[in-house]
Amino acid sequence: MGLSDGEWQIVLNIWGKVETDLAGHGQEVLIRLFKNHPETLDKFDKFKHLKTEDEMKGSEDLKKHGNTVLTALGGILKKKGHHEAELKPLAQSHATKHKIPVKYLEFISDAIIQVLQSKHSGDFHADTEAAMKKALELFRNDIAAKYKELGFQG
């Protein structure tokens, strides 16, 4: 399940493009998540009042949270699978405080892929998509294992 050095390099290359505008990418990821899976919005008290895409686009709080999400994910990706220290507190908060099901992590992974395809179509080739999907799956599997350790059946 691990990624090769070459696959990690591909992931980090495309992630470098994301880092030029973490807040913008993050906001777009969350908007796609909420549009594609409106039930996920119930987990975000801060954003429940945002009913339209325009309201979401105008929300500085949504943009800030998108930045937070992608900053955390970038820190994990840069560890190239050696992300135990970064993952533990994230799993803890998402299992015990936020109660985010693993399924929702799949949904946001899909949204990330869609945003990368949309914003970086010239650089997001089949090998890039495959490597990123593999990295996100590794992240989700490791979060799911932590959830299990914590007794969260998300």
Curated annotation (Swiss-Prot):
Entry annotated with the keyword Nucleotidyltransferase: no
Its EC number(s): 1.7.-.-, 1.11.1.-
GO molecular function annotations of the record: heme binding; metal ion binding; nitrite reductase activity; oxygen binding; oxygen carrier activity; peroxidase activity
Sites where the protein binds nitrite: 65
InterPro entries listed in its UniProt record: Globin (IPR000971), Globin-like_sf (IPR009050), Myoglobin (IPR002335)
Binding site for O2: 65
Domain Globin span(s) in chain numbering: 2-148
Name of a matching Pfam family: Globin
GO cellular-component term (any): sarcoplasm
Main location, first listed in the record: cytoplasm
GO BP field: oxygen transport; removal of superoxide radicals
Keyword Zinc included in the entry's annotation: no
Domain of life: Eukaryota
Keywords annotated in UniProt: Cytoplasm, Heme, Iron, Metal-binding, Muscle protein, Oxidoreductase, Oxygen transport, Phosphoprotein, Transport
The reaction(s) this protein catalyses: Fe(III)-heme b-[protein] + nitric oxide + H2O = Fe(II)-heme b-[protein] + nitrite + 2 H(+); H2O2 + AH2 = A + 2 H2O
Chain residues that bind heme b: 94
Task performed by this protein: Monomeric heme protein which primary function is to store oxygen and facilitate its diffusion within muscle tissues. Reversibly binds oxygen through a pentacoordinated heme iron and enables its timely and efficient release as needed during periods of heightened demand. Depending on the oxidative conditions of tissues and cells, and in addition to its ability to bind oxygen, it also has a nitrite reductase activity whereby it regulates the production of bioactive nitric oxide.
Family, per entry: Belongs to the globin family.
Subunit structure, as described in the record: Monomeric.
UniProt name for this protein: Myoglobin
Species: Canis lupus familiaris
Lineage: Eukaryota, Metazoa, Chordata, Craniata, Vertebrata
Designated gene of the protein: MB
